[in-house]
Amino acid sequence: MSRKIIMNLAMSIDGFIADENGGFDWIVGDGNNKLNTEKQWDYNKFLDRIDTVVMGKNCYNQKFYEEFKEKTVFVATSKSLDDYENINFINGDICKVILDEKKKEGKDIFLFGGGILIDSFIKADIIDEFIIGIIPTVLGKGRPLFLENNPTVKLKLEEYYIDNGVTVLCYKKR
Protein backbone atom coordinates (compact mmCIF):
# COMPACT_ATOMS: atom_id res chain seq x y z
CA MET A 1 0.00 0.00 0.00
CA SER A 2 1.51 3.31 -1.03
CA ARG A 3 1.85 6.32 1.19
CA LYS A 4 -0.62 9.17 0.87
CA ILE A 5 -0.14 12.92 1.12
CA ILE A 6 -2.92 14.18 3.39
CA MET A 7 -3.83 17.83 3.90
CA ASN A 8 -5.45 18.24 7.33
CA LEU A 9 -6.36 21.63 8.75
CA ALA A 10 -9.06 23.92 10.09
CA MET A 11 -10.76 26.58 7.99
CA SER A 12 -13.28 29.32 8.74
CA ILE A 13 -16.61 29.17 6.94
CA ASP A 14 -15.32 31.88 4.58
CA GLY A 15 -12.15 29.96 3.69
CA PHE A 16 -9.42 31.31 5.97
CA ILE A 17 -6.88 29.18 7.86
CA ALA A 18 -5.53 32.00 10.04
CA ASP A 19 -6.69 35.48 10.94
CA GLU A 20 -4.93 38.50 9.44
CA ASN A 21 -2.30 38.39 12.21
CA GLY A 22 -1.65 34.67 11.70
CA GLY A 23 -3.65 33.80 14.82
CA PHE A 24 -5.69 30.67 15.50
CA ASP A 25 -7.65 31.57 18.64
CA TRP A 26 -10.89 31.50 16.60
CA ILE A 27 -10.53 27.73 16.04
CA VAL A 28 -13.20 26.61 18.50
CA GLY A 29 -16.63 25.06 18.22
CA ASP A 30 -19.88 26.79 19.08
CA GLY A 31 -20.53 24.72 22.22
CA ASN A 32 -23.66 23.12 20.78
CA ASN A 33 -23.43 19.33 20.85
CA LYS A 34 -27.03 18.60 19.76
CA LEU A 35 -25.92 17.83 16.20
CA ASN A 36 -22.80 15.85 17.14
CA THR A 37 -22.29 12.67 15.17
CA GLU A 38 -22.02 9.45 17.14
CA LYS A 39 -18.61 8.73 15.65
CA GLN A 40 -16.11 11.51 16.41
CA TRP A 41 -12.96 12.67 14.63
CA ASP A 42 -9.92 11.18 16.36
CA TYR A 43 -6.84 13.35 15.79
CA ASN A 44 -4.61 10.93 17.71
CA LYS A 45 -5.70 8.08 15.46
CA PHE A 46 -4.84 10.28 12.48
CA LEU A 47 -1.38 10.94 13.95
CA ASP A 48 -0.87 7.17 14.27
CA ARG A 49 -1.23 6.79 10.50
CA ILE A 50 1.51 9.31 9.66
CA ASP A 51 5.27 9.37 10.17
CA THR A 52 6.10 12.51 8.19
CA VAL A 53 4.92 16.12 8.57
CA VAL A 54 5.39 18.92 6.03
CA MET A 55 5.11 22.57 7.02
CA GLY A 56 6.13 26.02 5.88
CA LYS A 57 8.57 28.34 7.61
CA ASN A 58 5.81 30.35 9.34
CA CYS A 59 4.43 27.19 10.97
CA TYR A 60 7.97 26.25 11.96
CA ASN A 61 8.56 29.70 13.46
CA GLN A 62 5.40 29.24 15.54
CA LYS A 63 6.99 26.02 16.87
CA PHE A 64 4.27 23.67 15.60
CA TYR A 65 7.05 21.13 14.97
CA GLU A 66 7.28 20.57 18.74
CA GLU A 67 4.19 18.35 18.72
CA PHE A 68 5.85 16.05 16.16
CA LYS A 69 9.05 14.99 17.94
CA GLU A 70 8.49 11.34 16.95
CA LYS A 71 7.89 12.17 13.28
CA THR A 72 10.14 13.27 10.42
CA VAL A 73 9.43 16.95 9.75
CA PHE A 74 10.14 18.73 6.46
CA VAL A 75 10.14 22.54 6.52
CA ALA A 76 9.92 24.51 3.28
CA THR A 77 12.13 27.58 3.46
CA SER A 78 13.81 30.06 1.15
CA LYS A 79 17.01 29.95 3.23
CA SER A 80 19.78 27.38 3.49
CA LEU A 81 19.52 26.00 7.01
CA ASP A 82 21.17 23.00 8.64
CA ASP A 83 18.97 20.03 9.45
CA TYR A 84 18.83 18.95 13.09
CA GLU A 85 17.22 16.14 15.07
CA ASN A 86 14.03 15.21 13.17
CA ILE A 87 13.81 18.53 11.26
CA ASN A 88 14.77 18.69 7.56
CA PHE A 89 14.90 22.13 5.91
CA ILE A 90 14.10 22.17 2.20
CA ASN A 91 15.29 25.12 0.15
CA GLY A 92 14.00 24.17 -3.27
CA ASP A 93 11.19 22.16 -4.79
CA ILE A 94 9.37 20.85 -1.70
CA CYS A 95 6.80 19.01 -3.84
CA LYS A 96 9.53 17.00 -5.58
CA VAL A 97 11.19 16.19 -2.25
CA ILE A 98 7.91 14.96 -0.77
CA LEU A 99 7.02 12.98 -3.90
CA ASP A 100 10.41 11.24 -3.56
CA GLU A 101 9.65 10.66 0.13
CA LYS A 102 6.25 9.22 -0.78
CA LYS A 103 7.96 6.48 -2.83
CA LYS A 104 9.81 5.23 0.25
CA GLU A 105 8.42 2.72 2.72
CA GLY A 106 6.55 4.31 5.58
CA LYS A 107 3.30 5.71 6.84
CA ASP A 108 1.29 8.54 5.32
CA ILE A 109 2.50 12.14 5.02
CA PHE A 110 0.73 14.98 6.86
CA LEU A 111 0.59 18.25 4.92
CA PHE A 112 0.25 20.55 7.94
CA GLY A 113 0.35 24.03 6.39
CA GLY A 114 0.49 26.96 5.86
CA GLY A 115 -1.41 28.31 2.95
CA ILE A 116 1.43 29.07 0.54
CA LEU A 117 2.92 25.61 1.06
CA ILE A 118 -0.45 23.94 0.58
CA ASP A 119 -1.02 26.03 -2.55
CA SER A 120 2.12 24.57 -4.14
CA PHE A 121 0.87 21.03 -3.44
CA ILE A 122 -2.60 21.84 -4.82
CA LYS A 123 -1.10 23.34 -7.97
CA ALA A 124 1.10 20.24 -8.37
CA ASP A 125 -2.08 18.13 -7.89
CA ILE A 126 -0.35 15.69 -5.52
CA ILE A 127 -2.62 15.76 -2.46
CA ASP A 128 -4.36 12.40 -2.05
CA GLU A 129 -6.73 13.26 0.80
CA PHE A 130 -8.21 16.52 2.06
CA ILE A 131 -9.35 16.68 5.69
CA ILE A 132 -10.89 20.04 6.52
CA GLY A 133 -12.43 21.07 9.81
CA ILE A 134 -14.97 23.80 9.09
CA ILE A 135 -15.01 26.19 12.06
CA PRO A 136 -18.33 28.01 12.66
CA THR A 137 -16.78 31.47 12.30
CA VAL A 138 -16.73 34.06 9.51
CA LEU A 139 -13.39 35.86 9.75
CA GLY A 140 -13.94 38.33 6.93
CA LYS A 141 -10.22 38.55 6.26
CA GLY A 142 -7.11 36.56 6.95
CA ARG A 143 -4.92 33.96 5.28
CA PRO A 144 -6.94 31.97 2.73
CA LEU A 145 -6.65 28.24 2.26
CA PHE A 146 -7.16 28.30 -1.48
CA LEU A 147 -5.23 30.81 -3.55
CA GLU A 148 -5.92 31.61 -7.21
CA ASN A 149 -5.39 29.62 -10.40
CA ASN A 150 -5.69 26.14 -8.94
CA PRO A 151 -6.42 23.11 -11.08
CA THR A 152 -9.77 21.38 -10.77
CA VAL A 153 -9.45 18.53 -8.27
CA LYS A 154 -12.48 16.25 -8.08
CA LEU A 155 -13.07 14.76 -4.65
CA LYS A 156 -15.29 12.15 -3.05
CA LEU A 157 -16.59 12.62 0.49
CA GLU A 158 -15.52 9.52 2.46
CA GLU A 159 -16.48 10.51 6.02
CA TYR A 160 -17.75 13.42 8.05
CA TYR A 161 -17.95 14.23 11.74
CA ILE A 162 -19.68 16.98 13.70
CA ASP A 163 -18.44 18.02 17.14
CA ASN A 164 -19.72 21.16 18.86
CA GLY A 165 -20.48 22.91 15.59
CA VAL A 166 -17.19 21.96 13.91
CA THR A 167 -17.73 19.83 10.82
CA VAL A 168 -14.80 17.66 9.77
CA LEU A 169 -14.97 16.63 6.11
CA CYS A 170 -12.72 13.82 4.83
CA TYR A 171 -12.30 13.70 1.05
CA LYS A 172 -10.26 11.48 -1.25
CA LYS A 173 -9.36 12.23 -4.84
CA ARG A 174 -11.65 10.64 -7.39
Predicted regions: what is each one?
Residues 1-174:
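Enzymes that bind and transform nitrogen-containing heteroaromatic metabolites
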